[in-house]
């Protein structure tokens, strides 16, 4: 994911009511911060990294149960390209329903220099293989 412009970042700021000038005021960011330029809102970076993990990790999820840890490791700037990688840590069967389990994963977000910018762990409830429905792409229609 490439942060091409400030627009998406500023829109996210406004939608989430995060009006901190570090994200929205170029003069402030240049003059009054150690970064010298606007920083992309960390929760936007987290949301994008989470979104990148959905097709592989939780595309068939029944529910996201918990975010155990969320760490913003380094700032992300407009023009940065973000990549994501997820590792499965553990899986356990549900104690209440035999058709599902809980998968624990950790996801890393990296910038174009390979620097870690975001890290989180989460638990996802997923159907067991024998109960999972075939996944379809959202743009596939039954009509063909």
Kindly label every feature range from the protein language model.
Residues 76-81, 85-144:
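HotDog/MaoC-like acyl-thioester-processing domains
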């Amino acid at each position: 994911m490439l942060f091409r412009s400030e627009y998406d970042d500023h829109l996210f700021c406004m939608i989430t009511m995060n009006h901190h000038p570090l994200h929205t005021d170029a003069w402030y960011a240049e003059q009054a911060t150690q970064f010298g330029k606007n920083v992309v809102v960390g929760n936007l970076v987290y949301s994008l990294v989470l979104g990148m993990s959905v097709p592989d990790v939780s595309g068939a999820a029944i529910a996201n149960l918990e975010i155990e840890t969320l760490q913003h490791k380094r700032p992300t700037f407009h023009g940065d390209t973000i990549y994501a990688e997820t590792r499965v840590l553990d899986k356990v069967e549900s104690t209440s329903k035999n058709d599902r389990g809980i998968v624990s994963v950790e996801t890393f977000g990296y910038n174009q220099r390979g620097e870690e910018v975001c890290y989180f762990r989460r638990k996802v409830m997923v159907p067991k293989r024998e109960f999972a429905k075939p996944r379809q792409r959202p743009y596939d229609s039954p009509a063909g």
